[in-house]
Structure formats: structure tokens, C-alpha cells
Amino acid sequence: MQICKKNVFLLYYGVLVFLSFQVSSSTDTISTNQPLSGFETIVSSGDIFELGLFTPTPDTYDHRNYYIGMWYRHVSPQTIVWVANRESPLGGDASTYLLKILDGNLILHDNISATRKSHTEGTSRRSPQKISEGNLLFHETVWSTGVNSSMSKDVQAVLFDSGNLVLRDGPNSSAAVLWQSFDHPSDTWLPGGKIRLGSQLFTSWESLIDPSPGRYSLEFDPKLHSLVTVWNRSKSYWSSGPLYDWLQSFKGFPELQGTKLSFTLNMDESYITFSVDPQSRYRLVMGVSGQFMLQVWHVDLQSWRVILSQPDNRCDVYNSCGSFGICNENREPPPCRCVPGFKREFSQGSDDSNDYSGGCKRETYLHCYKRNDEFLPIENMKLATDPTTASVLTSGTFRTCASRCVADCSCQAYANDGNKCLVWTKDAFNLQQLDANKGHTFFLRLASSNISTANNRKTEHSKGKSIVLPLVLASLVATAACFVGLYCCISSRIRRKKKQRDEKHSRELLEGGLIDDAGENMCYLNLHDIMVATNSFSRKKKLGEGGFGPVYKGKLPNGMEVAIKRLSKKSSQGLTEFKNEVVLIIKLQHKNLVRLLGYCVEGDEKLLIYEYMSNKSLDGLLFDSLKSRELDWETRMKIVNGTTRGLQYLHEYSRLRIIHRDLKASNILLDDEMNPKISDFGTARIFGCKQIDDSTQRIVGTFGYMSPEYALGGVISEKSDIYSFGVLLLEIISGKKATRFVHNDQKHSLIAYEWESWCETKGVSIIDEPMCCSYSLEEAMRCIHIALLCVQDHPKDRPMISQIVYMLSNDNTLPIPKQPTFSNVLNGDQQLDYVFSINEATQTELEAR
């Protein structure tokens, strides 16, 4: 009987919980008797918008701030469209927060216990309210709608499907509107929202994780009857022009053809609004980058797509690089850098390497009174004639302009613009770098220590030593003559022994079973034939420079065109790597692997003869602004699929399981039909059939392409190549080079840049512009998704190459990638080759045998 009663009680309790959940999850109203507490939310009647407590940093456990905000209910990741308490974030325990109707206002309260109060600062807005269970509670108003009190007891706050939160004087739809969120926007303009001309503005977030008001805003200029974007409430840098003409221009966008997006300008009631098809989702956002963007939600792709951004050039955003910062749109992100002699000054609380809002400050202070300052010319600059920072002298030649600045210690810089002389007596803002032979020369005042005076010192030094030099030379001639003969004898003997040793190694190579005459059309060429084929390694025959030496184009006596790789004497690749590359390519035969035709080991020279690839390496096309236009979407996918097939052969289907270890764009060669072929096997490793991973003392490869476990711990596996392939795939889709991100300047790596873009727009913004409209957006998004799966930190999280081949050829659902660790890289394609000990145990590298 007791068990039966217990079951009935549990059933009754469960029904009550279910019914209460249904009520709380379906309500769209906050009333006097129905406040919102903790993480409770209200949802618009059409299940479109949701309002409640959120945090922009859900992954942070310490110092987490909370805000009352509104977001799309079925959009992921969470997209915030309105924030109530932008300037008053909530901290501490979220369960103490209460959003309720009080005295005709919607008010956000923070009920703080006496214990918690003792650890908080400032009590000016808190007062004892009541004693509950022995704890004294303090009551704080964090945010309020701030309207005149209403005598009605039926005041309600209702969330509508338009995204408008309305405070009205009663439950009926005809009740008077006391306040609405559309009149107090944050950074987002939603369909149906009205911009009251001359009073309302949209202000960007301070950063992607900080909703507080930022530096940029969208306002209405009543004098020009146009929308303008403004920096720091003081400097406008973009204008729509006459509003009517600007609104009409939207009809010309191909992405908007067939939609019902329309703008309405009502000058009588002084507002502007826009409407869309109820089934679609559009929004206009004032972004943290200072760009005003029109975005549409793609249901199939589950991402926001930017249709329009104004201004479309990041460098047109006023002061995007701060004081004495130079903006260059053609530069790899970030587009900002400091002028010479200056260093970046971080904004308070910011450690973002892309953030130049704090501007740049001098490395060495000026000492004008000592006449120790000089002027450094910076060419091809677009100058901003801001009247607050630059004085315009309407007359005077270039020499006059320079002399005026030199004589004035407050002059920071000058420039001559035709007949005008520009003089900066304060900080210089909005400097832009243009293409060669464009713009003007900007003369920057620097301390002498920041400008090289090596030539002057060299001249003075040469004068001082002109008397001593003949005496020194005379005393050294006799000694030098004695040493020359001795040196020639010793060096000749060393060269002779080295040649004998190398020829012995060469014979070992030929006789040791690595290469046999039954090989795949392999042949040995003597050095003389190769010299003839390359015209003595002429510059005109040079195709490029690889990690281990230059590559030349040659023509054999039988008329065949070949590519000849000449191992550099300074290269870290020795005879071991040379043997490795020869044996691997001989034993590996696949249409997506480069074919080795011959070799030469003679004296100091080690050469490999490959089949000639008319389109050279992928990096020569991909990272060239003009040549990249040849790589349309179909061609890029052909390269991606061919590379995966070649890599799958190495990992799974070849006689030897091979880990390449240096997969990158410069090691992907393209034939005349753009078929990719993987090359450069000098650093490859042979794995046993059942071997999963290996360790090495010697880390070889290229910064930016190496997996974390390999670069930091020397652990090699198939997943090391998968990581490199992920970076290569990101490069192919974005057209950006992984090794352009400099570690010393603390710039983001390519992976960090791609990850942030993927989080914001599912990666749409990173797709290479030269592809124009040739690409399939869905395929591009899928490739970016696959690439991010490949560059995950842990090898076990990365897919196998066979899984990648399947992902690229199917449209099955992909797993969600984990955020990778953002690593920085060295400047340029720098080969890494160093030795370290793992757990103090000596490891040796396997050689091909």
C-alpha cells in the first residue's frame, strides 16, 4: 500500500512539473504576478525570439558577466539582437537576478545576501529590504525602462515575433505603449524597427565578447538626410548619401532578387523602417569592425551570410588602426601595422593581436631641442586631412613645407599634396598604404636612433683609417701569401677525401638494393649531362626554391623536359634524406604522386630528376593575386580531391605506409591539366603495417603546417599529415598563406583567423574573392568544416584520410569541430630542423632500406 501511494505521489508531482514547464516555456509576457528570475526566459508567440539572461563568454568560469538580452530562438550559435543592461553587466550568482514589473516599469533587480554584500564594492543603490531565514537581503536596481509611473496594475512586458519587447498599460493589444525596445536599439536593426530620424542610433559592441557600447555607431544626419557611420561620436567616415537614392540601390543586389525586402522612408513622421518576407530573416548590424552589414540567415547552411557591408573596405573605417597605425587592405589579417619607430599600444584589458584601437606609441622620445631628430619618408600613403590633427598650409613648395616642420618642435610629420602642405602637430590618424606609385610620401619625425645612419658612420670611419690602412696591408701581404699556399693544399686534400666519401656513398646507394636497374624507368645521369640540360644551372632555367634547394627546368638529350632538384650545400637534407626520397618515390607509383626519372650523386652535388610539371607548384598560383584567378572552384576541388587520393595511397594502399611530414602548397605540383602531384619525400617516414605512431628527436617540416603533438613532442602519425592537409585545405579555400603570420608581432595564425570567421559566419567571409561566383557555397562551407576537423588539437579527434575522402564526396552530417589551440608561426616559409630529447631517451630516425 505504501508503495502504491508513493507511485501516485510521484506521478502527481511529475504532472505538475510538466504542466509548469509548459506554461513557463510558452509564455511571452512578464507581468506583476509573473516576473522572470535566474535563467528563466520568455518566448515570442511564434517561437521566433527569446528573452532572458545570457553571457557572451559561456566558456569562461571566472569573472563571467551576465546580461538581459534577446536572441533568435532557433539560430545557432546564439545571435544576440538586443541587450538591456549594456553598461551595467551583472556578476556573481545569476540566481539572484529578477526582471519584474514595479511601479509601471520593467526593472532588473539584483537581490544580494548580506554575506555576498560584504564582498562587493559600493552600496549606494542598495538598501536593506527584508530578513529571510536569518539573512539580510539588499536590493539593487541594475536597469529600468525609466518611464513615468503608471497607475495601472496591469502593466505588462510582451515579447513579439518582430523582436520588439513592448511595455504596455494593460493586457489588451489596444493598450497604450509605454516603452518598446525598438526605440532603444543596441547594435542590430530588425525588420519593422523604426529609426527615429535625428534621435536614434545603433552602436557596435565593444568587442565580440563585450556588449558594452563600442566606438562605432550608425546615425542619421538631418542636414544631409543620410545615414552615416561615426567613430567615437566625433568623426563620420561613411555616408549613404540621400536616403531615397541609397534605399533604391538595394534593388540592384543579385542576392535580393525575388525577395520582399523593402525600405520605407516617412519624412512626415520622421522615421525609416524596412520589411521582409515573414518566412525569411534579415538584420542590419553595426559590427565591431566599424562596418555596417546587411545579413540574411540561410536555413540550409545554418549560417548568416553578409550581403552588403558599408564601407566595403576595412581601411575606409575611420581610425581602424589607431594613431600612427597604417592600414593596408592587401595585407594578411590584421591589415594594421605601426609606422617605423613606433610600437603597438594595447587597449586597456585587451590582448587581441588584431586590436589596434589603442594606436601606436614612439619607441624613442623626440629631443627636438638637441637637433637629434630626423624625418623618415614613407611612400605610397593615402593621407587623411583631419582638421583636428593636420594643419593645411595652402601655399609653399615642398622645401618650404619641410623647413616649416623642421623649425617647429611640435610638428610630428608633414607631407606635400600638390600645392598644399600638410603638417601634423598631433597624432596622425587614418593612414593608409596604397599600391606602388600611388598616393603621397609621408615624412615622419623620428629620433636619430630610430633611423639608420650606417652610411655616415662608414664614411667617417673610412677617413680615420685611410692613413693606417696602407701600413696594415703592407704588413699582412707577406703573412697572407704564406697562408694561401697552406690553405690551398689543405682544402684540396679535404675536397678530394670528401669526393671519395660521397662517391662511396653513391656506390652504396646503387649497390645496397635501394635502386635497381629493374626500377620504374630509373636512370643515372652524370653531372655533365645535367649541366648541359640546365645551361649550367642558369637563372633563366630556375623554376623555384624548395625547402632543400633550387629546382631547375632541363631538357634531356632525348628531348624530354624534366625538373631537376639540386640539393643545396647549406641544406639540412643530407645523404640520408636523399636516399629516403629516392627509394620512396621509386617504390610509390600513383597518378597523384610525382614521378622520379633519375638521379645523380657526384662530388658535392646531389640531384634528382623528376617529370616536368608545366604549372609548377600550387603556391605559385594560389598566393598570387593575379594568377589565383586561374584557380576557379572546380579547379580547386580537383586539386583537393587529387591530393586526398595521393595521401590516401601513402597512408593505406601503398606497399609502404608513408607519413609525408611536410605536406604544404609548395609541395603540390600541377601538370598541364591541373592534376595535383605530391612531391618532396626527403623527410617522409616509413611505418610498419600495424604501427600507429612513432617519436623522433629531429623535428623537420614547415612552421604553420606541423601538428601540435609533432612540433612540441616529436610524435609522428598519420594524423600529423591530416593536420597539414587541414591547413592546406584552408589555404586553398581562403587563398591566404599559413606562414604569413609573424610570431614576434603576436599576430593570429591562419587557423585562428579561419576559426573566428567560421564562428561568426560559418566561414563565408574567408572564401577567396578571385573565385567570384564560380564556387558552390554549400561545398565551400563543407570544405571549411572538414578543414577545421583536421586541425583539431588531439590526433584522435582528427578524421582518417579515408573518412576525409568520404566526407568530400558525400553530404552526410559532419561532426562539430573543437576549437583548436591558436599557434603562431615564423615569418615566411621557414623550415624547422632541430634536435631535442623526449623523456631523456635518445631516439633515432628510421631510414628507408
Swiss-Prot record:
Domain EGF-like: 311-348
Gene Ontology molecular function terms on file: ATP binding; calmodulin binding; carbohydrate binding; protein serine kinase activity; protein serine/threonine kinase activity
Domain Protein kinase residues, every copy: 537-822
Keywords: ATP-binding, Cell membrane, Disulfide bond, EGF-like domain, Glycoprotein, Kinase, Lectin, Membrane, Nucleotide-binding, Phosphoprotein, Receptor, Serine/threonine-protein kinase, Signal, Transferase, Transmembrane, Transmembrane helix
Signal peptide (from-to): 1-26
Entry annotated with the keyword Glycosyltransferase: no
Chief location: membrane
Residue stretches making up the Bulb-type lectin domain: 27-180
Family of the protein in this entry: Belongs to the protein kinase superfamily. Ser/Thr protein kinase family.
PANTHER family: PROTEIN KINASE DOMAIN-CONTAINING PROTEIN, RECEPTOR-LIKE SERINE/THREONINE-PROTEIN KINASE SD1-8
Record's protein name: G-type lectin S-receptor-like serine/threonine-protein kinase At4g11900
Organism: Arabidopsis thaliana (Mouse-ear cress)
